[in-house]
Amino acid sequence: MEPHKVVPLSKPHPPVVGKVTHHSIELYWDLEQKEKRQGPQEQWLRFSIEEEDPKMHSYGVIYTGYATRHVVEGLEPRTLYKFRLKVTSPSGEYEYSPVVSVATTREPISSEHFHRAVSVNDEDLLLRILEGGHVMIDVPNKFGFTALMVAAQKGYTRLVKILVSNGTDVNLKNGSGKDSLMLACYAGHLDVVKYLRRHGASWEARDLGGCTALHWAADGGHCSVIDWMIKDGCEVDVVDTGSGWTPLMRVSAVTGSQKVASLLIEAGADVNIKDKDGKTPLMVAVLNNHEQLVQLLLDKGADATVKNEFGKGVLEMARVFDRQNVLSLLEEKKKKMPRKSSVH
């Protein structure tokens, strides 16, 4: 039987570079030898890929085996890497290939870059990303907000205009049902509010709690925005579909702002309107201990004698919840009221 013929190793070619991304490099090599493989594996040539450590100026093995392809992963974008191939014969003889240098690509633009540009008000980066066309303009961030919602909430008027001119949908809603107009109204960004209205945003839209932009503006407490909204046609006594509350009710419940309440009342808000439980703005203000708002509502004609659906009036509510200052106001008001004639 003829002994196994040992062929002396020649210097191998450097690895061939295949697909390169921002985080991986494909290398393959010695395709001719693969065709000639015969016999048991221990008689095959063994391959190792070594990568240079640029700080130590030395090479470390990142792959060894009999395959003729390897994908190096976990790399940094836009970085130069150096590799060499080591070929070892069954007898232990080995040779190194020349070094091959490969640079990873730039990291592709993702929705994260897009949202980051909006979040930090980077107009130039936003324009570059939009011009590249790699990102869907209405893709939400991890909180369910579109870029327009973020820009509207932060008051970045120029970014709002860029996004709208590039086709963003002004009426999209986040997970709680709020649209960009509601967010801008709450945050008090009048320029953004006006621009969104000119480009199709609606006062009639409601969030999941049934609230409109005017409810959110009342919560935000920005009088200049509320004043403009009413002049633009907002219904001042619009009722939410949850509790049956008007914006004035929201003020009584949330902030107790006299300024906002005065503005709403001057625009025609009904001080004696009732919610689904028969509560009036005065009752809600009493329950939340908004003393100055209680005084304002009384001055503006709020009826202190009405009862809710359960037969409770404001005096009883103030006593039960120990609202002493509010109780004093109500009792003072009661003293000044003309006594109604009653039949005993």
Curated annotation (Swiss-Prot):
Q: List S-S links within the chain.
A: none
Q: According to its UniProt record, how is this protein modified after translation?
A: Polyubiquitinated. Polyubiquitination leads to proteasomal degradation.
Which superkingdom, per the lineage? Eukaryota
Q: What induces it?
A: Expression is activated by FOXJ1.
One cellular component term (GO) for this entry is: ciliary basal body
Please verify whether the record's keywords include NAD: no
Record has Ubl conjugation as a keyword: yes
Gene3D superfamilies in the cross-refs: Ankyrin repeat-containing domain, Immunoglobulins
GO aspect biological process, one term: positive regulation of DNA-templated transcription
List, for all copies, the residue spans of the domain called Fibronectin type-III. Answer: 11-108
What does the record note on quaternary structure? Interacts with COPS5; regulates the phosphorylation of JUN and the transcriptional activity of AP-1. Interacts with RYBP; may prevent the ubiquitin-mediated proteasomal degradation of FANK1.
| Record's function text | Through the activation of JUN and AP-1-mediated transcription, may regulate apoptosis.
Listed PANTHER family: FIBRONECTIN TYPE 3 AND ANKYRIN REPEAT DOMAINS PROTEIN 1 (PTHR24183:SF1)
Protein name (record): Fibronectin type 3 and ankyrin repeat domains 1 protein
Q: What is the lineage of its organism?
A: Eukaryota, Metazoa, Chordata, Craniata, Vertebrata
The encoding gene = Fank1
